Amino acid sequence: MNMGQLTQSMEREGSSRFVFLSRGLAFLARPSVAVWAAIPLRLIVGYGFMAHGFAKLSRGPEAFAAILHTIGVPAPHLMAWLTILTELTGGLAVLLGAFVPLVSLPMAAVLFVAMLTVHLPYGFSSIKLLSVTSGRAQFGPPGYELDLLYLACLAALVFGGSGPMAIDHYRRKK
């Protein structure tokens, strides 16, 4: 049964709310609307990477290098700077929709390293409720869920395009 048949069936049964909802959602699936889907992905992925890069930079690259050394990453000072630069420049590029397929590769590498060296031992979930004390929730270390979400968003942008209002979009038009 296709969407049209399902809608007609629901109309006959008197489910007007469903019909209104399905027609509203069908509007979102139109190609003229769907092209805009890349913009919220670009905004959250770009901002997220930049926020993490700025956090590492503000605490000092040496502090991040010490963490990398502790978990056994080779050349921790070099890798700290490469990670920070990847997060800042890659995040800005994704935010602007510039060279997204190119910058996604080092960004994905950062995510894979973080997932394998930090988050994997804590399982999938990004939220681990440990306890509630004095009316306050205490959470444990996050799992690899957010790494996978970021990777999925990057893949969607690479395979689906950066969307309108992106530097990549204007470069393709020329």
Identify the function of each model-found stretch.
Residues 2-58, 77-85, 89-92, 96-174:
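Extended, low-polarity transmembrane helix blocks
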Residues 58-78:
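Membrane-interface interhelical connector segments
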